[in-house]
């Protein structure tokens, strides 16, 4: 399926309700391969993450929230070799049947986030129950 076809299907799909977004992310970590992970805690909607860009480690602390319209956002203060920066990152989710589409807002390309058959290649398979971010984040914070 081409990117244009995925975009067309996503445009016809419905926004995922807030309850559905919450179920997908609550107390789960989104694993970013070797490049980091972000944890979406239920308690105080805390967001904790670590990243690695070209071998340079960094971390982020903040909150995550659901502004409606199928959106998930996290606002964090990021700390790294290049200094500190505040950032707001949002993703939009749309659903048609059991298929969920996702894109980074404002202008990311749509892709299949979760297939109807839960394909192992789906990005959703990288969203795991539990905290896979805080331990690494704490190790990064502890380095002089």
Language model feature labels by segment:
Residues 1-61, 67-144:
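Lipid interaction determinants
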């Amino acid at each position: 399926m081409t990117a244009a076809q995925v975009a067309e299907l996503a445009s016809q799909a419905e926004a995922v309700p807030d309850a559905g977004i919450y179920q997908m992310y609550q107390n789960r970590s989104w694993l970013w391969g070797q490049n980091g992970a972000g944890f979406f805690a239920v308690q105080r909607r805390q967001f904790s993450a670590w990243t690695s860009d070209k071998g340079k480690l960094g971390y982020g602390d903040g909150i995550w929230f659901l502004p409606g319209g199928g959106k998930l956002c996290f606002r964090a203060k990021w700390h790294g070799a290049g200094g500190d920066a505040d950032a707001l990152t949002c993703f939009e989710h749309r659903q048609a049947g059991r298929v969920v589409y996702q894109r980074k807002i404002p202008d990311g390309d749509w892709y299949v986030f979760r297939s109807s058959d839960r394909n192992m290649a789906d990005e959703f398979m990288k969203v795991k129950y539990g905290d896979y971010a805080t331990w690494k984040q704490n190790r990064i914070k502890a380095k002089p």
